[in-house]
Amino acid sequence: MDRQKILIADDEPAIRLLVSRMLGEEYVILEAADGEEALDIAERQQPALILMDLMMPKVDGYAACLRIKADQVTKEIPVVMLTAIGHELNRRFAEEMGANGYITKPFTRKALLEEMRRLLPPA
C-alpha cells in the first residue's frame, strides 16, 4: 500500500520535525520552510494534504492557501492551517482563503490525525 504524501509548511524547523515524527510512520512527509516553497512543492508533488502555518516568510499561509485553491493543479488538495493564532476572526479568514481545517498550536497527535482523516480520501 502506498503511503499518502503530506506537505508540512512551517518556517519553524522544530514544528516540521515534531509533525514529521507524529506522522512519518503513516505518511510520506514533504517539508517547506516558507509559503513560496510550499506553493512550488504543492504543484510539483501534489500531496494528499497540506499542513500550513499562517505566519511564514515570503508568502504567508493565507496567501499560499488562496493561490493553492486558485490553481487548477492544486485546488482539490485539502489545506489545514496549523497556527498559534487561535482567534475566531483568523479562523474565518483562513476559511475564506480556502482552508479546509484549522488547528491551534500546541496540538496533540490525536487532534492532528482526526482532522487529517476527516479530510483525506482513503489511501
What are these regions (language model features)?
Residues 13-30:
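Two-component/phosphorelay signaling modules centered on CheY-like receiver
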Residues 27-33, 41, 103:
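Short hydrophobic/Thr-rich beta-strand motif most characteristic of the beta2 strand and flanking loop
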Residues 45-51:
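Active-site beta3 strand of CheY-like receiver
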Residues 56:
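Receiver (REC) domain active-site loop signature in two-component systems and cognate sites
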Residues 107-116:
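C-terminal output helix
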